Amino acid sequence: MVETNDRKLPVGIQSFEEIRKQGCLYVDKTDIIWQLANRGKKYNYLSRPRRFGKSVLVDTLESYFLGKKELFEGLKIMQLETEWVKRPVIRLDMSQAGAEPESVRSYLDDAFHTLETEYEVVVRQDSSFAVRFKNIIEAAYNKTGLQVAILIDEYDSPLQHSWKTPHHEACTSIYREVFAVLKSQDKYEKFVFITGITKFTQISLFSVLNNLSNISFEPEYAAICGITKEEVLMDFKPEINRLAEYEGWTFDEAVAQLTAYYDGYHFSRRNMVDVFNPFSLINALADSDLKNYWASSGATSMLPKFVDDMELKLDNFDPCTILRQTIETSDVTGGGAELFLYQSGYLTIKGYQMGVYILGFPNNEVKQALYETVLPALTLRSNGDIQSTQSSLFLSLQLGNLSEAMKCLKALIADVPYSNKKLASMDMEERYRLIMSTIFNAIGCRVEVEKMIATGRIDMVVETINFVYVLELKLSNNGGIDAATEQMRVKQYAEPFKADKRKVIALAIELDDKGKGLVDWKEV
């Protein structure tokens, strides 16, 4: 048995101080953090998906600016920092501010009151938030004689959650008032760092702070959040060995599975280093289990606000393209679905050519989560109605139980092509392909639609751990099961997969031409 009992992983811990004092494993980013704090620009903005380590980064910066040298013993920063100046820090965590103007005001009032007490600011009863913020910055400087570090974490949380509600404009107005102060207080500020997921350019953070440097795409900061493959192999060997032992894998097989599930993020066209989702990776290694941790933590809750009719569009996103100007500078509310999906972590950079980014799904966890999210809207059924059937379909495909798998598939697609009016613009076979590929993706299979081979185009290839399913679909009024069977035999659709170690199963499937569902199937 691999011993990992003496190693603590920082599951659910966002405090750098707590990570260090409890002796938790810490992936050392302090050399990059020191460069950002000392060699970067004064005003910095970093966008990364939710649960990607932004808050730990902000907390580490706070500990650094507060001069807490003891927390950094043994880390890379000790070779770089010589002075350890303790300076005043103003930190705001806007994820605690709710999604209504009243809750935003309440949070700012409470946060400012704490800072006013610390820096002995006399507050007039009629003072606006902008005046109070200005006075806090000046008082912190005057009391210490040192310029202030200002850290604003998850700045966009109230704006994102209030988007497309009556509260959004009022929340935006508060932001314009308060954060315009940052520019006028330049001489009192040492370093300003703002994190978020999505970019709302109409607020004063971006319109007033014309010197705000968006470091989100800079190559030197590509891995400032998240965990690289090199760091995984260096820091997590005992946990990977334990996972391998539990699952009956070799070490390399365990790494390959972790990579397929949680790796694949890229944040700079000039530094395409692979980055793992840290939340999912650390949870998976702590549990010795591969699950959809990031998605199940609420990651998909904002999708309906930003992506209309997503159930019809998912296949268009992998791959998709977006102009450099759009992805690097545009407001999320006007940049299209691709921009939101990139900023929030559902798409990542796959390549770059002549001013155009190529985007795609980063990994299996994200892809499955997206398809799982849209399946109820596509099938016109609730999650509760289809989850049991989905589970049975997945198990049947894993075991090669064709009769049970086709029974489940028939139940899931019954009447859907006919009943879902959003599909009306598609021809009937196209509707079936969309519905079936969404179902297979949602249960975690690897799916290729209309796969080209030397002899023709296969309607669908569905892969599980033990099986490769080659599907040919035919409508009842287009020859049905007999035509599908004949085409598979003549064109030898299963032949290119025979070298695969997995069992290859060729399936001819007949579908009702009126959209009522699966009529018949046959193993070829």
Map each language-model feature to its residues.
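Phosphate-binding site recognition
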Residues: 1-428, 443-445
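Active-site metal-binding core of divalent-cation-utilizing nuclease and nuclease-like domains
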Residues: 140-144, 439-465
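Structural motif
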Residues: 149, 467-469, 505
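Mg2+/Mn2+-dependent nuclease catalytic core
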Residues: 169-175, 475-494
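Metal-dependent nuclease catalytic cores in nucleic-acid-processing enzymes
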Residues: 178-185, 339-347, 437-442, 487-507
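Conserved catalytic cores of phosphodiester-cleaving nucleases, focusing on short active-site segments
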Residues: 436, 460-462, 466-477, 491
